[in-house]
Amino acid sequence: MVVGTGTSLALSSLLSLLLFAGMQMYSRQLASTEWLTIQGGLLGSGLFVFSLTAFNNLENLVFGKGFQAKIFPEILLCLLLALFASGLIHRVCVTTCFIFSMVGLYYINKISSTLYQAAAPVLTPAKVTGKSKKRN
């Protein structure tokens, strides 16, 4: 199901806010065991994806369709936000958030490039049809 840019901006902003609030409400529980600290990093990675989606949708509304997110400032700003939110829980959450965010960013980039990039024409070299002389 495809939603518009404005609706996607509202949904991703709301999910970012709810995820950040949930991470702060349950920060003691997320920091209590090893597995939950890893889950805290996974939640931070989700915060990264949702905030990047909201930021890019806002740019598309302001600057027009076809505006793409670049590494600086969009991706770094959203990554720092997610790492800061994970750091408020536990130090290990920062590391796992970074790892999960990089994996998520790789797959977002892979899906985006297959959907939105035009295929470059492949040039094949022309076959030479003629006699070639051997030189010694």
Curated annotation (Swiss-Prot):
Q: Where in the cell is it found?
A: Endoplasmic reticulum; Endoplasmic reticulum membrane
Pfam families reported in the protein's UniProt record: Keratin_assoc (PF09775)
Q: Which residues lie on this side of the membrane: Lumenal?
A: 1-5, 56-75
Q: Name one GO biological process term.
A: protein N-linked glycosylation
Q: Where are the transmembrane segments?
A: 6-23, 35-55, 76-108
Annotated membrane topology is: Multi-pass membrane protein
According to the lineage, what is the superkingdom? Eukaryota
Keywords in alphabetical order = Endoplasmic reticulum, Membrane, Phosphoprotein, Transmembrane, Transmembrane helix
Positions bearing Phosphothreonine = 124
The tissues where this chain's protein is expressed are given as: Expressed in skin, heart, placental, liver, skeletal muscle, kidney, pancreas, keratinocytes and dermal fibroblasts.
Identify this protein by name.
Dolichyl-diphosphooligosaccharide--protein glycosyltransferase subunit KCP2
Native source species? Homo sapiens (Human)
